[in-house]
Amino acid sequence: MANLSFTENGDKAYNTSGSACIDFFVRITRSSQLTDYISTFGKAWNEDKNIAMKILYNLRDIRTGKGEKIIPVAIMTYLKFHLNSDIYNSIVTDFVTMYGCWKDLLKIVEIETRFRLSTPSVSNKNINPIEIKLFADQLQKDFDTVNNNTGSSKVAISLCAKWAPSEKQHYNKAPLLIADSIRSQMGLTPRQYRKMLTKLRSHLQVLEMLMSTHQYDKIDFSKLPSVALMKMKNAFNRDTNSQGIKSDFRVNLHTSYTKYLQDLSKGKTKVNTKGIQPHELVGQYLSSSDFDQLVESQWDAIKKGVSDSGTFNNVTAVVDVSGSMHGQPMQVAIALGILVAECTSGPYHGRVITFHEKPSWHHLTGSNLMEKVKCMRDAPWGGSTNMKSVFDLVLQNAINAKLKPHEMIDTLFIFTDMQFNQCDCSGLESTFEYGQRKFTEAGYTFPKVVCWNLRTSNSKSLPLMKNDEGYVMLSGFSAELLKCIMNAEEFNPMSMLLHVLEPYVLNPVFINSETVDINSIIDDESNKNNFNKAVERSKFKKAYKKSSNTNSTTNSMNPRRSTVSSEDWVLN
């Protein structure tokens, strides 16, 4: 009974699933506090560092994983203070080149530098400028590749130059000076460094460079990264620049973009979706009712990617929009609910269940995402996570329709924060135990259940144990995990975790290393606060400007360089 807990709404639950790795995989969401995700990762690390590391890779994986940004980067930075150079180098290289983005290295350096400057006890601990070396080595490799190309075809290079900091950007201001450190590592003068970046970015056709130099005719919308395309669509869709000045260049850009959207609607061209998550598209329509062809095409591409991985048969989704799900988690629940409804075949296609004291089926009408989001917005919502009534609804529907056992719902997705209402006044029977009992009594097999966590709750409770058959627990905002469920051979929390992690390969250097204690720094309250501040400050794109007073100090990433103290920089 020591593991017995309760949800925020009183339902029977557990303090832990019985596996620290599952707890980390399921509990940690974008709303998690630093104390939560560092300590939860530490427990997973102590249980099995190899599985914990694979979960961290999946958490960052922008292609087939959860695609989270700041949490995995913060954990990777934290690990740097505990691992020797060889071990850290082996994992950070894979972290960036296989699963993340070159910008991750900039964030790691920033968090590390600010933490060192504010925390004397770690100022000289495990100094290892591997991030600078990775940038320098890759830039040199790409520069050589471009210069040595004598053929007529364009050679492929990495995106390192896109993210490498320029001299006058945020990441080269004190106390960071990352561009200066990279340039010094490469043995280049400032002018040589600038010319190298210009050449590589021109080769990559980096959007920001094409826009700033008015080379609009070179923009290929079908090849633009999804996030860049979404951010810049308003700029593409007007005849003027940001100052309202009209020009022939901007008119031509607008015309080209309009033609691209027309081709998209006819299926004559493509759109990238890597990096865009379903809720970001649904969010466009929750804040605006204007039709957007780019949003529609990106949604269709995501839906096709899920459908091409397999087919959901007799599947339906329960969408939690209770009060605790306000904001982003609610957007995700709506988006993933619509996606499941569209990707399932059979009688439950296009249908979802909404949480309410008296939940109901809701049929999604409309021919496009805009209309389906409006349909969901008009659905009857309630502020209750009454899962017991959902099971009653599904069962009564089957009894009334005289469904045969094989016609019953096969899998039930619950997009939620897992804080279900109390099922039994005595607290002895959980919602799921109730559902299993009622279905069995009626002669039906209880559906497989996917508990998809979208918010880190205050109670930190979990509804299931690691080996509970017929159930899985997931978390995150990405649709990529839907594909894993389609292809899973076993259906319990532990088996599903291992199935999700199958693609992730660890470096032998890391595998063969001993498990070291990674809790020593965060155990100190002052250190914890300083690390949290460093992480929070790294979220600002242009966080600091120079004040009138400057003092000389040592840059932790470049000890020989004189810089100003962090205290002499203030928030913009």
UniProtKB/Swiss-Prot annotation:
Organism listed in the record: Acanthamoeba polyphaga mimivirus
Stretch list, region Disordered: 543-572
Name assigned to this protein: Uncharacterized protein L728
SUPFAM superfamilies registered for this protein in UniProt: vWA-like (SSF53300)
Record field: transmembrane: none
Domain of life of the source: Viruses
UniProt biased composition (Low complexity): 547-563
